[in-house]
Amino acid sequence: MYKKILFICTGNVCRSAMAEAMSKKMLKDFGLKGIKVWSRGLAGSRMIKVPEEVLKLMDQEQSNLDTHISAPLTAKDLSKADLVLVMESYHQERIVADFPEVAGKVFLLKKFAGAGDGDVEDPIGLAEEDYRACKDEIKDYLQKVILKIRIANDSNDS
């Protein structure tokens, strides 16, 4: 059963932040309650701001990130989470190396969505269309992930 879902990227201002915001909206739209979602970055810092491109894209998705503050990943985050979804294989490798006890709940977002292996590439510093492509890719995976979570949670409830 997945009740606490953590998204992780590098800086926690683009990929994981978008995944958090969009998944919260999707969960609400699907009427799925009691699922906590949050995000962190391996190099998260209050000093890093969400890029304007990301703020615009999330506004278009009705998934506001205006008050989002980048935060670093902690051991407490990992122990609290039922499911940890990362954007790059490097993120998974680093987390499992530092916290081997959580290896069984850390997955690449793309792989957990059933879309094969591979990373969700970081668009930071690239063109606006790269941010949009990243957002679209994450949104597609999230739709699959939320369906998977819904099925898993329904089967555990019965």
Question: How would you describe each model-predicted region?
Answer:
Residues S16, E88-S89:
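Helix N-cap/beta->alpha junction signal
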Residues M1-K80, L147-D157:
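Conserved active-site segments centered on acidic
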Residues F7, L85-V86:
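Hydrophobic beta-strand core positions in alpha/beta domains
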Residues L83, S89-S158:
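Phosphate-binding/catalytic loops
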